[in-house]
A protein has these predicted regions:
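The feature captures the beta-strand-to-loop junction immediately N-terminal to the Walker
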Residues: 35-37
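Helix-to-loop junction immediately C-terminal to a conserved catalytic motif
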Residues: 50
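Conserved ABC transporter NBD signature motif
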Residues: 58-72
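Conserved ABC ATPase "signature" region
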Residues: 96, 110-128
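Conserved ABC ATPase signature
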Residues: 132-136, 140
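Catalytic Walker B motif of ABC-type/P-loop ATPase nucleotide-binding domains
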Residues: 157-161
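Conserved beta-strand-loop-alpha-helix hinge in the C-terminal portion
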Residues: 207-235
């Protein structure tokens, strides 16, 4: 079976075509990276998978259902999540929020709290459950958002640039937390970081209106073709670390 099936899928914002007649599958249990230039349609694909946007034409099935109807079986990790610093919400409360859509106020039962604590263990933050979100570093916050998604016990995990705002050391913790999850669910990871995609996924979908699947690791010629001469971000984390890029402060 397929976790995602796209057949002749198209989508436009007004007169601007973003996704143009694409067909591809993501198999059950498969981890897939989504790469490509800015504005190519990567985040739009995630919105379509979540049912936040509807295709203009073609067919999209997610977990065997029309996109949107399977929303409660999907975990979603956004690029960043912010909470009002004046409201001291705890880490465990944030993780429990992930179950509200599925269970309503039943999300706060003892059983659900145990599931939330288990999700925090999977991302190595079990000792942080009573801390407030504002106390955490950027990397720790991202791992909390993974735990929040995992607490829903999803069949499909979608992530949108989850390491964009964290530094190298935090990213390593993030990778460690995520690597152990691949066997439990299908994963779609949107990222500009080609090294991250190579480490955590089985193949890559290049999105630039059309979609092309690439095996990993990507060769230099393929990378140049994907980004079409546009200025790319620096993908090599080791080089970034050696150059002393600590522009994003993170104590994770």
């Amino acid at each position: 079976m397929n976790a995602i099936t796209c057949t002749n899928l198209s989508f436009s914002y007004g007169k601007v075509k973003v996704i143009d007649d694409v067909s591809f599958n993501v198999r059950d249990g498969e981890s897939v990276g989504v790469i490509g230039p800015n504005g190519g349609g990567k985040s739009t694909l995630l919105k379509l998978f979540l049912g936040l946007e509807s295709p203009m034409s073609g067919e999209l099935k997610v977990l065997g259902e029309v996109a949107g109807k399977s929303r409660r079986r999907i975990g979603y990790v956004p690029q960043a999540m912010r909470f009002d610093p004046l409201y001291p919400i705890s880490v465990i409360e944030i993780v429990l929020m992930g179950r509200l859509d599925r269970l309503g106020f039943g999300a706060y039962s003892k059983e659900c709290r145990a599931a939330a604590e288990n999700a925090l263990e999977k991302v190595h933050l079990e000792d942080f459950k009573n801390r407030t979100f504002s106390e955490l570093s950027g990397g720790e916050r991202q791992r909390v958002m993974i735990a929040r998604a995992l607490a829903t016990e999803p069949d499909l995990l979608l992530m949108d640039e989850p390491t964009a705002n964290i530094d190298l050391s935090a990213e390593e913790h993030f990778i460690e937390a995520l690597a152990g999850l691949r066997k439990d669910m299908s994963i779609v990871l949107v990222s500009h970081d080609l090294e991250l995609v190579s480490e955590l996924t089985d193949s890559a979908l290049c999105v630039n209106q059309h979609v092309h699947r690439h095996s990993l690791p990507l060769g230099g010629e393929t990378i140049r073709e994907i980004y079409s001469g546009r200025r790319r971000i620096e993908h090599d984390r080791k080089t970034r670390h050696q150059q002393g890029d600590h522009s994003v402060c993170d104590h994770d």
